[in-house]
Amino acid sequence: MKIIKADNYQTWYIEYNDQSILIDPWLSNSLTPDGTFFIQRKKINKSCLSKEDIDKVKALIITAPFEDHLHIDTIKKLPNDLPIYTSSVVSKALIKNSINNPRIILTEEGTDICSINVKALPTSYPYFSTTFSILMRDSNGNRVFHEGHRVNFRYLSKENIKSDVAILTAEESKLFGFVELGMNYKKTIKACELMGSKKLFITGNKPNNTKGFIGNFIKTKGFNTERLSKNIEVFSNEGDIYKFNGE
């Protein structure tokens, strides 16, 4: 597998055997139209992906029904025959927005996507009813775990979930100052240690860059890069790439 942090926020590109999956793609400069009241975020580059990369995309995974994960405009600009792997909650939102791509519900049992076995695992409060974590495993046994908000430590421990690479939040964000939306770096380290992950990609960078009405109620705190880097190789920048041996 090859992993690319496809933008400076939380779009992910997973390639294997010359086919690829896009996770939570947002491929425009503005998250919502100018003047949008509730939420807004902007970025200089739409993504770092080339046309060749995009042409390899054979499937989408949408992990949450929120606008910064489920970006309708991006999906509408991609081929409408791309299958979308997601939850029942997101599937309903896709139908509501007249997205006619094939829709497949991911489960803990696992589904093969682009020769990668993909499982949807439980996440943590307050997201457990609307989002899911992803565990990917290729035919060589390489594993990647993705969680865009908060990991479910109890589940990871009980099920002995292991992963070579983790894609996690590390910059604390709290709604109203106490409802945790994104993990702080200490919890990120704990998750990596629990799963045995030696490589870490940061997702959801700089939550303080999310503006609009919701931004007034979210308090954020940056992460300690040096502390993270002691025992874990950290990838946090747009365009960062990791390839497993033999890829």
Model regions and ranges:
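Zn-dependent metallo-beta-lactamase
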Residues: 1-44, 215, 239-240, 246
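Catalytic core of the metallo-beta-lactamase
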Residues: 6-17, 112-165, 180-187
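Active-site environment of divalent metal-dependent phosphoester hydrolases
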Residues: 8-10, 28-30, 65-70, 91-94, ...
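Pre-active-site segment of Zn-dependent metallo-hydrolases
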Residues: 19-61, 73, 151-159
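Active-site neighborhood of phospho(di)ester-bond hydrolases with catalytic His/Asp-centered motifs
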Residues: 23-24, 57-68, 85-88, 144-150, ...
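Active-site HxH/HxHxD metal-binding segment of metal-dependent hydrolases
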Residues: 32, 45-111
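Metallo-beta-lactamase
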Residues: 86-141, 232-247
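Cap/insert and terminal regions of metallo-dependent hydrolase folds
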Residues: 89, 153-244
